[in-house]
Amino acid sequence: MKKKVKAVMPYIRKGIINFKMGPYEAWIKIGGQVAKPHYPCLKKIVGFFHNYELPSFGISNKEARLRFIEPINRKFDAFPDYCRYEIIPMIWDCWPCLDDRMSAWLKKHDVKTAIFTSRQNAERIQKRFPDMNILVVTEGVDTSKHHEGKLLKDRKIDFLEYGRTNKLVIGESDFEGINHLCTGNLKKRLTDEELEDAMADAKTTIVLTKNYTDPAIGADVETLTQRYWENMLSRIVMVGHAPQELVDLIGYNPVIEVPIGYNSEANFRNEVKNILEHIEDYQPLVDKNREMAVKLAPWNLRMQHVKEWLVGLGYDA
């Protein structure tokens, strides 16, 4: 009998958007089945199940659960389905420093099939579990949330920083002589809608993979995150570094690459200044980037691929 695969909605903390909702909602849109979540209702209990697991009993031979998991929260992200069902984890942020913990969890729950959002992370885990079915699906976005904005020459924000801190590469001081908006320095956190509007009104932004912004965690891993798609959809000139996953997927480098090393801060400031002085020259690039992102960024495409892959493995998805 084929096991029926049902996805479970990620846990939502009050006032915080869970990025893992993107693939879950896409799974529903493509006709994937879902199961009711059973998260604990008391906050104190939530904390307990981040650190401790319930025992397994009577694993179902009729159904499997597609769960959306970060290694640091692996126990809670799969709660409590690991007790009764085969878990098919879709895994984000499986950095090298977490390999031992993630591998122990995969072994404990006899995971046979897994999905990773990073090619390099998947390759390391595959070496530890050569018989495991592993699929790599890069991060996507809901393309409808990011509009193309104004032409570059008509935008008000010269340089936008948001998301990860970039101080290890470009320092902490503002770029002088331009309208530099760093969302991390604002007294009030921008809503998603406010950030999307800011992106649609920004000329340039910095994009870096985690191995540059947080090398202690990122190690040598560079991966395609949703931020690249969001910038491409918003037609912002991206300055920094593109992960090879993105270049391979779309067939060209959409980022203005800047040498990162001893003189990174000066390199970035000079490059941004040069781009702003010739901003209209970059309109064709950002137009192409948006066109490519509209075509290749949607979560629906990725989850359809996941669904077909699972069917090919013998699941009822």
Features from the language model and the residues they span:
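Short, hydrophobic/aromatic alpha-helical segments in well-folded domains
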Residues: 194, 227, 271, 288-289
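Nucleotide-sugar donor-binding catalytic core of glycosyltransferases
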Residues: 2-64, 69-79, 89-252, 299-303, ...
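C-terminal "capping" alpha-helix adjacent to the active site of nucleotide-linked donor transferases
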Residues: 262-280
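Acidic, glycine-centered active-site loop in nucleotide-sugar glycosyltransferases
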Residues: 248-259, 270
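A charged, aromatic-enriched C-terminal amphipathic alpha-helix characteristic of glycosyltransferases
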Residues: 276-311
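Generic C-terminal helix-cap and adjacent flexible tail
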Residues: 311-317
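CheY-like receiver
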Residues: 198, 271-274, 309
